[in-house]
Regions:
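Catalytic machinery of carbohydrate-active enzymes
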Residues: 1-239
Length: 239
């Protein structure tokens, strides 16, 4: 029964794009024990994957802005102890950044990652015991799947399963069909204009499609409220 540690800390889209690789691992290595290191704000997403035994949260984003605090170094020391508390057969860093490679370096196990030409930050490859070439032009989902397959020794099959267990109920009444508008981003410069969301929502509403706008933080709630003034929009509760 192989023990596998996945290192993919952020951001939300990258974390979701890594889920099919984890499903592949579970399918090809039945009984494998899979743990996943992820940024604390995305831990709940990883916990939805049916094949992940343990979610190990980190706070790299918070730590970077507080390196002068003793509490930061205390948390880093606790993370290292946790990662070294049990051995892994494979440590797979599918992020390809120096920060993720350093996290993998803390763990006990054979460290796998992208080679210098494939990694997003070439220097990260120095921290791996085994380096794998994966074409950079592929979609992130396919790159993650190919890396895992190369590290664990199986062939990638067509198609992919995200393996996420979704809740069967929503906090509001939903009619079918519906569209889910994910309006939030990690940075303001990545936001799509609110007027564009309203325009798209109006076009979908004209076709009988209900638009749902989930939100988390207060500023996201306000943004969704402004967008939802267009016909056919509904705001769901916080996520």
């Amino acid at each position: 029964m192989p023990r596998i540690l996945i290192v993919k800390t952020s951001s939300l889209g990258d974390v979701v794009h890594n889920c099919p690789a984890v499903t592949d691992i579970a399918r090809h290595l039945p009984g494998a024990v899979i743990d996943w290191v992820v940024e604390e704000s995305f831990a709940e997403v990883v916990a939805l994957h049916r094949s992940v035994r343990r979610v190990i949260p980190v706070a790299v984003r918070r730590w970077r802005g507080a390196l002068g605090r003793a509490s930061t170094w205390s948390e880093l020391a606790a993370l290292r102890r946790r990662l070294r508390s049990e051995p892994y057969d494979y440590v797979v860093d599918s992020q390809g950044l120096v920060k993720s490679a350093l996290i993998g370096w803390m763990a006990r196990g054979l460290r796998h990652g992208f080679d210098r030409e494939s990694a997003r930050e070439p220097f990260a490859a120095r921290f791996y015991d085994a380096r794998h070439a994966v074409p950079t032009g592929l979609h992130a989902v396919e790159r993650n799947r190919r890396l895992a397959a190369a590290a664990l020794g199986y062939a990638v099959e067509d198609g992919g399963d995200y393996g996420l267990r979704a809740a069967n109920s929503l906090p509001i009444e939903v009619r079918s069909p519906f569209a889910l508008f994910l309006t939030m981003t990690s940075r303001d410069d990545k936001l799509w204009a609110e007027e564009q969301w309203r325009s798209l929502g109006a076009k979908l509403a004209a076709r009988g499609i209900q638009c749902l706008l989930p939100w988390g933080r207060e500023e996201e709630r306000r943004r969704c409220a402004r967008i939802a003034v267009a016909p056919g929009h509904s705001r769901s509760g916080p996520n």
